[in-house]
Amino acid sequence: MAFWIASSPHNHNHTKTPNLMRLVIYATLPGVLAQWYFFGWGNLIHIGLAMTTAIICEFTVLSLRKKPISHELFDGSALLTALLLGICLPALAPWWITVIGTMFAIVIVKQLYGGLGHNPFNPAMAGYVMLLVSFPLQMTLWQPPLTLVAVDLNFTNTLTTILTGFTVEGYSVEQVRTSIDGITMATPLDTLKTNTGLGLTVLESIKNPIFGENLALGWEWVNAGFLLGGLFLISRKAIAWQTPISFLLSLFICSFIGYSISPDSSASTMFHWFSGATMLGAFFILTDPVTGATSNKGRIIVGLLAGLLVYLIRTSGGYPDGVAFAILLCNMSAPLIDQYTRPRTYGHLKGDK
């Protein structure tokens, strides 16, 4: 009896790119909703503006490159890039910040290198870092949670502030950032970094209202939302578990060592986990299959390296949150890491080329 044997691979994956992109977008909803609940409409407006800009840029570049627009424009990758960038921006950043960042992410970082699957860097993080370096003032005007803001940031006020720089009543962004107590607010990471640099202890720093009663007012729930979405992606096997778990483990170990050595000047492990962009970076950006490592060992190494870099930048660098910089550095290292962690090909001896 003759048997017909199909050529390898025998294990097929029927997941299509648009389906995967939609799944990741859906998984961000808990974090985005928490962001809206605690910080208002700002990021939702930026997300909508970024998505519109991304579609226009993608359509224009695909037309110039004479690529199949109907297929590549609607694969969801541009929308996901815009979503991640919109999440990361300050809620009251001016509208042109979103447009410039999205154009850079789509046109330069993604399409200039050949489109989806060819970009060496994560487009959203590259766009964010470009904005942070080029426009540091606009990119560091973080809005405190709504409970600490003296101005009513409804949808109209927020939209007007993003478009003009002033609320309907005439308040500037700097005035909006002023708390009910008359103190200009910053993020918990920024506040802690500034205060410890001035010689204050962590215990003295967390008396600031921005820290709330737990870890970081509002930010802990935003991170919890992205953690929930990330676990959903792992359960659906949409992302590999090695990278986010090793990243969180590395950040936990580094912060635990720092806190054990100097609790007066080092934040706790849970603070590092549930503040800034920790969970967003762990589950939604580091797991990018295009710019990350491909082998299981490589993914673990990338996660460990990213966690170490985030901790070092947060504690010793010039920026309060180092997730974006750490991810781009890991993107640069991923090809080299893959080179030395590539599994042996079946049928070949170790060391064979």
From Swiss-Prot:
Where in or outside the cell it occurs: the entry states: Cell inner membrane
- Main EC class the enzyme belongs to: translocase
Record field: transmembrane: 20-39, 68-88, 129-149, 215-235, 238-258, 267-287, 300-320
Q: Name one GO cellular component term.
A: plasma membrane
Against Pfam families, the record matches this protein to: NQR2_RnfD_RnfE (PF03116)
Cofactor(s) the record lists: FMN
UniProt-listed InterPro entries:
NqrB/RnfD, RnfD_bac
Look up and give the membrane topology term: Multi-pass membrane protein
Q: Which GO terms describe its biological process?
A: electron transport chain; transmembrane transport
Which keywords appear in this protein's UniProt record, sorted alphabetically? Cell inner membrane, Cell membrane, Electron transport, Flavoprotein, FMN, Membrane, Phosphoprotein, Translocase, Transmembrane, Transmembrane helix, Transport
The record's EC number reads 7.-.-.-
Q: Where is the PTM FMN phosphoryl threonine found along the chain?
A: 187
> What family does the entry list?
Belongs to the NqrB/RnfD family.
Task: Describe its function.
Answer: Part of a membrane-bound complex that couples electron transfer with translocation of ions across the membrane.
Quaternary structure and partners: The complex is composed of six subunits: RnfA, RnfB, RnfC, RnfD, RnfE and RnfG.
Write down the PANTHER family for this protein, in alphabetical order: ELECTRON TRANSPORT COMPLEX PROTEIN RNFD, ION-TRANSLOCATING OXIDOREDUCTASE COMPLEX SUBUNIT D
* Protein's recorded name: Ion-translocating oxidoreductase complex subunit D
Q: Which organism is it from?
A: Colwellia psychrerythraea (strain 34H / ATCC BAA-681) (Vibrio psychroerythus)
Gene name for this UniProt entry: rnfD
